[in-house]
Structure formats: structure tokens, C-alpha cells
Amino acid sequence: MAKLTKRMRVIREKVDVTREYEINEAVALLKELATAKFVESVDVAVNLGIDARKSDQNVRGATVLPHGTGRDIRVAVFAQGANAEAAKEAGADIVGMEDLAEQVKKGEMNFDVVVASPDAMRVVGQLGTILGPRGLMPNPKVGTVTPNVAEAVKNAKAGQVRYRNDKNGIIHTTIGKVDFSAEQIKENLEALLVALKKAKPSSAKGSYLKKVSISTTMGAGVAVDQGTLNTQA
């Protein structure tokens, strides 16, 4: 049997895996157990009551968190003409067309989000095998293929998170940093859950938000009592 690290022993002593914690208690636990030498992210896992094998029950989208994610997001935009100018004014870090595509092909991808205007997809479409596996391929479902590139850039910079269930029907995303206040983490989590409720597939039956757990980058998951959250859309 693998030997438990001191950190894992402390987590096992502190976190009762059989219970759901009131949100402020859950956040206090995360902060207490976050002992890494860097500011850890606060991540969330949401178990959805969907059948992920059925395409009409998959959940995918994006929402802007009220307090952002605590990360400085670099945005690349494929656009030309007026759209390119609008993207630059909105704060895009890199804007281009064929020249930007060449950078991507060389592996020069110093950005976290890619946005494209619809007319630029003829160029972006050739980059699917590079951008796709990295989760960077623009998609209209999450608002990154849009005629309003300026708004997409502002959303990304403001702390928009993109979500998509995995094959087990679980959503994984980041909702902040461990140095956020408990109220900021709570409000970000609530905003995400409201967005997920709105994205509920019509064919999904029974309980939808089955389990919500929060964790830090290096920590264990703490289940949250949804009754202590305000998720009325």
C-alpha cells in the first residue's frame, strides 16, 4: 500500500468524505488545507444527471464569473479589417489571419483563448488538429466564433469560463484562487451553477445537479451542500 504523505494524512483527518459542507465551511477548509508554495486555484467538479453517451444530453457553454478566475488571460483573435481593429481596442493580445495561423503551425501559442470572426474560419479550420487537442478551437457554442469579436475578447479578459462535460457526465472548471474571499468563491460558484441549470438538456431526466465538489490545485475535494447556495436563475 502506498505510503500517505503528511499532506494527505492531514486532509484525511480534516475532510469527512461522507458529508456535504455548508459553502462557507467548505471554503474555510480549502483555505486551511492549501499549503502549496503558490496561490492555488479553486476548482469545481459538478456531477450532472445526464447520459453523456447521448449527444443531445451533452452540456457545453461559457459564462462570465462575477469575480473572474484570478488569471491573466491572453487572447488571440483571428479577424481582419474592422473586426481586427475592434479586437485590438477590446484588449486582444494577438490579432491576425494567415500570419497568426503560421505562428500556430510553428507551435508559437502564447495565449489561453482563441476567438474568430465567422469569415476567419476558413483560416482557423486548417488548424483544428493543433488547436483542438489543446481545447483552443473556436466554437460558436461557447461564443468564440462570433461577429462581435470585441465582446468575446472582453468576456475572456473578464474571467469567462468555458465548460463541457466529460464522458462520465462531470463538469470540471476553475472558479477562482484560494486567496479570493469566501464570498467571491461562493458567488462565482453560484454563477456557474445558474449557467449549468440554464444549459440543462430537455431530454435529461431526474436530478440534474447531483453533486458539487470544490478543491484546490493540490488538495482533496470537499462536497458542498447545495442548499447553502443561491442558484435561482
Curated annotation (Swiss-Prot):
GO BP field: regulation of translation; translation
The keyword Signal is annotated on this UniProt entry: no
The keyword Signal appears for this protein: no
A cellular component annotation (GO) from this entry: cytosolic large ribosomal subunit
Gene3D superfamilies associated with the record: 3.30.190.20, 3.40.50.790
Keyword tags: Repressor, Ribonucleoprotein, Ribosomal protein, RNA-binding, rRNA-binding, Translation regulation, tRNA-binding
Cited CDD domains: Ribosomal_L1 (cd00403)
Source superkingdom: Bacteria
InterPro entries noted in UniProt: Ribosom_uL1_bac-type (IPR005878), Ribosomal_uL1 (IPR002143), Ribosomal_uL1-like (IPR023674), Ribosomal_uL1/biogenesis (IPR028364), Ribosomal_uL1_3-a/b-sand (IPR016095), Ribosomal_uL1_CS (IPR023673)
Pfam families referenced in this protein's UniProt entry, alphabetically: Ribosomal_L1
One GO molecular-function entry: rRNA binding
Assembly information from the UniProt record: Part of the 50S ribosomal subunit.
Function: Binds directly to 23S rRNA. The L1 stalk is quite mobile in the ribosome, and is involved in E site tRNA release. Protein L1 is also a translational repressor protein, it controls the translation of the L11 operon by binding to its mRNA.
Entry's family note: Belongs to the universal ribosomal protein uL1 family.
Official protein name in the record: Large ribosomal subunit protein uL1
Biological source species: Vibrio vulnificus (strain YJ016)
